[in-house]
Amino acid sequence: MLRLDLQFFASKKGVGSTKNGRDSQSKRLGAKRADGQTVTGGSILYRQRGTKIYPGVNVGRGGDDTLYAKVDGVVRFERLGRDRKQVSVYPVAQEA
């Protein structure tokens, strides 16, 4: 009897290297303080790339467009017209 051992398909596929499998670390952008929250001067309010939100009253803008409080007070997110937003910090009145 004649025994035929024919293989038409590879039993082992060739193993190549992948070019995937990398990802950058998240930059943790976005709001760091909420509307109505009390903050101290120097507190970071919003981390962003570009000016998604503009600095308002008592708010400064850092070199990487981070918004920070210049004084102690309460955070307020406000609208500027139809398509702009700003964040302001209003000092709390001191009771004597």
Curated annotation (Swiss-Prot):
Residues 13-35 are annotated as: Disordered. Pfam families: Ribosomal_L27. GO terms for cellular component: cytosolic large ribosomal subunit. GO terms for biological process: translation. Transmembrane segments: none annotated. Residues 1-9 form a propeptide. The N-terminus is cleaved by ribosomal processing cysteine protease Prp. Gene3D superfamilies: 2.40.50.100. GO terms for molecular function: structural constituent of ribosome. Keywords: Ribonucleoprotein, Ribosomal protein. Belongs to the bacterial ribosomal protein bL27 family. PANTHER family: LARGE RIBOSOMAL SUBUNIT PROTEIN BL27M, RIBOSOMAL PROTEIN L27. This is Large ribosomal subunit protein bL27. It comes from Bacillus cereus (strain ATCC 14579 / DSM 31 / CCUG 7414 / JCM 2152 / NBRC 15305 / NCIMB 9373 / NCTC 2599 / NRRL B-3711). The gene is rpmA.
